[in-house]
């Protein structure tokens, strides 16, 4: 697992500031939707995968203008069933 460097990515974007914005936007998408990765994960974090995608040319500065899939609201999880050992506590009050 080779580490990615900023110099690898700067060939694809104009400056470091644009690189930060591009990588952070892509990393947020990858954190919520890991199946959309254009490179293999190799047990990396979303930020590393985003930088690898930029270095390999899969993600370009045009990505900043694209609308991305976001989940504005958290996933609703079902409430857990009441435990039997806690059901008798209401009777004691």
From Swiss-Prot:
Residues 74-93 are annotated as: Disordered. It holds the Pfam family RNA_pol_Rpb6. Its EC number is 2.7.7.6. One of its GO terms (biological process) is DNA-templated transcription. One of its GO terms (cellular component) is DNA-directed RNA polymerase complex. Transmembrane segments: none annotated. InterPro entries: DNA-dir_RNA_pol_omega (IPR003716), Pol_omega/Rpo6/RPB6 (IPR006110), RPB6/omega-like_sf (IPR036161). One of its GO terms (molecular function) is DNA-directed RNA polymerase activity. It catalyses: RNA(n) + a ribonucleoside 5'-triphosphate = RNA(n+1) + diphosphate. The keyword Transcription applies. The keyword Chaperone does not apply. Keywords: DNA-directed RNA polymerase, Nucleotidyltransferase, Transcription, Transferase. Belongs to the RNA polymerase subunit omega family. Promotes RNA polymerase assembly. Latches the N- and C-terminal regions of the beta' subunit thereby facilitating its interaction with the beta and alpha subunits. The RNAP catalytic core consists of 2 alpha, 1 beta, 1 beta' and 1 omega subunit. When a sigma factor is associated with the core the holoenzyme is formed, which can initiate transcription. This is DNA-directed RNA polymerase subunit omega. It comes from Methylococcus capsulatus (strain ATCC 33009 / NCIMB 11132 / Bath). The lineage of its organism: Bacteria, Pseudomonadati, Pseudomonadota, Gammaproteobacteria, Methylococcales.
């Amino acid at each position: 697992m080779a580490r990615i460097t900023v110099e690898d990515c700067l060939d694809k974007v104009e400056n470091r500031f644009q690189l930060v914005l591009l990588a952070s936007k892509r990393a947020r998408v990858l954190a919520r939707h890991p199946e959309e990765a254009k490179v293999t994960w190799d047990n990396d974090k979303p930020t590393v995968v985003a930088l690898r995608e930029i270095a390999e040319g899969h993600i370009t500065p045009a990505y900043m203008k694209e609308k991305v899939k976001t989940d504005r609201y958290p996933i609703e999880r079902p409430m857990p069933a009441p435990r039997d050992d806690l059901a008798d506590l209401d009777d004691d009050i």
